[in-house]
């Protein structure tokens, strides 16, 4: 048991180093490449994480480049790496303003034109919608974690916050839901852990909701939760 715990900790340290060094290199290239499609080509270097760590990301479904809003559950820092590595479009993340203020790391967001929101600002929703329109006009699909923060990677999602709903309704967006399974087992920063586990990205079929229905957002969460549970039980049986 102690041997397994030590092994998991050492694996986590190695993966943390791969992420830290890789991110540093990508940020440098992003700076010089930032005017070229928001450095999308250098951001794709996130795929090196998988070859350097031996992690195999199982992918089910396909990316729909016609979808303008991507919603997915959140477990780990790796969730961002998963999409940055493989999504074919110049995606734009919607993240907390505090992340952009982290020394050095913040450049990964600010140099690439991501949307940073101030949750404490009562007028923040106006700024958010203005920024979303700007990115949509640039043909950049928006990506948001509707839970708003990292979950624990168990069976249940955290309650969805209203941000994704407001954005989708305002711009009548086609949505592609996605679910991530076991990314927290591949790398968890608090506590520092990493396991040998299967991990999967499931890309559900895109659709434009019936925005006149008062329950469409709850139905989206139920759909994602159901799909997540199916794969969660399969990978963790």
UniProtKB/Swiss-Prot annotation:
Motif (HXXXXD motif): 74-79
GO BP annotation list: CDP-diacylglycerol biosynthetic process; phosphatidic acid biosynthetic process
Keyword Repeat assigned: no
SUPFAM superfamilies documented for this protein: Glycerol-3-phosphate (1)-acyltransferase
GO CC terms: plasma membrane
One Pfam match: Acyltransferase
Family, as annotated: Belongs to the 1-acyl-sn-glycerol-3-phosphate acyltransferase family.
Free-text note on domains in this protein's UniProt record: The HXXXXD motif is essential for acyltransferase activity and may constitute the binding site for the phosphate moiety of the glycerol-3-phosphate.
Name recorded for this polypeptide: 1-acyl-sn-glycerol-3-phosphate acyltransferase
Organism of derivation: Helicobacter pylori (strain J99 / ATCC 700824) (Campylobacter pylori J99)
């Amino acid at each position: 048991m102690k041997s397994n715990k030590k092994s998991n900790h050492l694996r986590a340290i190695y993966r943390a180093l791969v992420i830290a060094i890789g991110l540093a290199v990508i940020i440098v290239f992003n700076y010089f490449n930032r005017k070229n499609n928001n450095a999308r080509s250098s951001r794709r270097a996130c795929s090196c994480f998988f070859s350097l760590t031996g992690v195999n990301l199982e992918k089910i479904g396909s990316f729909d480049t016609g979808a303008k809003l991507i919603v997915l559950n959140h477990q780990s820092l790796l969730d961002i790496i998963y999409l940055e590595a493989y999504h074919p479009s110049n995606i734009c993340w919607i993240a907390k303003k505090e992340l952009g203020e982290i020394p050095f790391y913040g450049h990964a967001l600010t140099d690439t034109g991501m949307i940073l929101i101030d949750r404490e600002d009562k007028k923040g929703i106006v700024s958010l919608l203005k920024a979303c329109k700007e990115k949509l006009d640039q043909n950049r699909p928006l990506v948001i974690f509707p839970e708003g923060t990292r979950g624990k990677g168990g069976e249940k999602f955290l309650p969805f916050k209203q941000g994704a709903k407001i954005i989708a309704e305002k711009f009548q967006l086609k949505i592609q839901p996605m679910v991530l399974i076991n990314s927290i087992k591949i790398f968890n920063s608090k506590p520092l852990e990493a396991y040998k586990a299967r991990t999967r990205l499931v890309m559900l079929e895109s659709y434009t909701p019936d925005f006149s229905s008062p329950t469409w957002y709850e139905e989206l969460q139920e759909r994602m939760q159901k799909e997540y549970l199916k794969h969660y039980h399969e990978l963790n049986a």
